[in-house]
Curated annotation (Swiss-Prot):
It catalyses: D-glyceraldehyde 3-phosphate = dihydroxyacetone phosphate. It comes from Lawsonia intracellularis (strain PHE/MN1-00). This is Triosephosphate isomerase. The gene is tpiA. The lineage of its organism: Bacteria, Pseudomonadati, Thermodesulfobacteriota, Desulfovibrionia, Desulfovibrionales. It is found in: Cytoplasm. CDD domains: TIM (cd00311). Belongs to the triosephosphate isomerase family. It comes from the Bacteria.
Length: 252
């Protein structure tokens, strides 16, 4: 399977800054290698601008959030229909900042997962433990609970739309990176849980690592067992560092 590199810009970059960054990325001589799938998750207001700049590119656009209803009295929210209208084909679900800062509950994450898959969106479902849960020895149970809560009873035809991102909460934006053994252990566990839930087709689900990924550590992380890509935060905000990450892990 192809390595997937996903860029989560979070609440960064206005439209002009987003346009400038994409123009710089697309003009770099390295180019986007065919060995990589690339998804960008910009702020909502930059989606249209970026989509226009990427119309001749293999890079695709996703949204960082949406509300699981087709329309209605949900002040401040965005629907999947609206995202389709601006050309989004991916959505990010369950990111630790939405779980722990915004306060999204497992039931909402489950609703979002199932609705997005039913609409034909590809999704990156984020899971991961807090520092307190890790210290209490709860990593395995937390990851299994998050997966089972979100993915129980999803139709087999939707498996190809699903990507999992392991993001230990204590490593998000902190500069701390999980050790290689921690990553291998978590990704191997995730792969086992997915197999128990879904069966052999789960082998087609890509598992990404996210957590203070940068151009210096990307290659070594991609070499690890059961790591099929990266979810990149701050290091995706600059064209130079993001291009290095895109090219990490192989020689042309």
């Amino acid at each position: 399977m192809k390595i997937l590199i996903a860029a989560n810009w979070k609440m960064n970059k206005n439209r002009l800054e987003a346009k400038d960054m994409i123009e710089k990325l697309m003009s770099m001589p390295e180019g986007i290698p065919p060995q990589r799938d690339i998804v960008l998750f910009p702020p909502f207001l930059a989606i249209d601008t970026i989509k226009e700049k990427l119309k001749n590119s293999t890079i695709v656009i996703g949204a960082q959030n949406f509300y699981p209803a087709p329309s209605g009295a949900f002040t401040g929210e965005i629907s999947l229909e609206m995202l389709k209208d601006v050309g989004c084909s991916w959505v990010l679900i369950g990111h630790s900042e939405r779980r722990h800062i915004i306060g999204e509950l497992p039931t909402l994450i489950e609703q979002k997962t199932k609705l997005a898959l039913s609409y034909g969106f590809s999704i990156i479902l984020c899971i991961g433990e807090t520092a307190q849960e890790r210290e209490a020895g709860l990593v395995n149970s937390v990851l299994e609970q998050q997966l089972r809560t979100s993915l129980t009873d999803i139709p087999s035809k939707a498996i190809s739309q699903l990507v999992i991102a392991y993001e230990p909460v204590w490593a998000i934006g902190t500069g701390k990176v999980a050790s290689q053994q921690d990553i291998i252990t978590a990704h191997t566990l995730i792969r086992k849980i997915l197999h128990n839930m879904i069966g052999n087709t789960s082998q087609n689900i890509r598992i990404l690592y996210g957590g203070s990924v940068n151009s210096e550590n990307a290659s070594s992380i991609l070499e690890l067992d059961n790591v099929n890509g990266l979810l990149v935060g701050g290091a995706s905000l600059q064209a130079e560092s993001f291009m290095k990450i895109i090219h990490a892990g192989f020689s042309e």
